[in-house]
Amino acid sequence: MEKNDVTLRHLLDLCRKSRKAGAWQYSAFISPAEQEDLLRSPEAAGFDFRLTGGCENAERKIQAAGSEADFGPPDPPIRAVGVEPKSVKYAEQLSHRDYLGAVLGLGIERSVIGDICIRGTRCLIFCLPSAAELLVSSLAQVRRTSVTAALTDADVPEFQPEYRPLRLNVASERLDAVTAAFAGISRGQADRLFAAEKVFVNGRTVTDRSFRLKEGDVLSVRGFGKAVYDGIDHETRKNRYCVRLRKLV
């Protein structure tokens, strides 16, 4: 059985458990692809649930299974841990991979870690309470940079997602056309990205070049960034299209 199938079965079981117990039930963090599977499941349509990651436009989220009308407002078990260097002067330029590697190196499971947001030398890690306790007590180094970790407020303005608007001239909404324009490369070079499985839509690998993007889809091209697709702005005089995206910066 595929991993996503196992996850979907577990999420549906939580919905049944919530209905039976008369209380909110919460999952661990799930990927965008797993969220999409849940939202598309015909069986899930019969249950009440919501997805939340602890911050606006979170990519990794937990499922809160239940009904606010029946159980009151949910209280998702998500914590935010702020990480910063002990000395900014000697801090390295750390990446998402660096922080994630340091976290997993403590023996923490990926499923209890949500989004990792980086702004300059500071980082905000969304996680479940068990991981938060371990991070605060044990995370002391990321690569060669000594750091401190502490529980913090998730609603920190500087960590809210920032987007840069883009307008791209493309032949169509086909994924290969938008990918090439977004990455600033030729269609042939874009083909190699598809062959290497480096193009994702809503967290899922897409190798079908003719796939057509829909408004609200999240396009991610490894090595070139991520953007929200906002659809066609207008058709040009040469029968091409000006499409709008918001690139995460």
Residue ranges and their predicted role:
Residues 193-194, 213:
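Short, well-ordered loop/turn sites that connect or cap secondary structure elements
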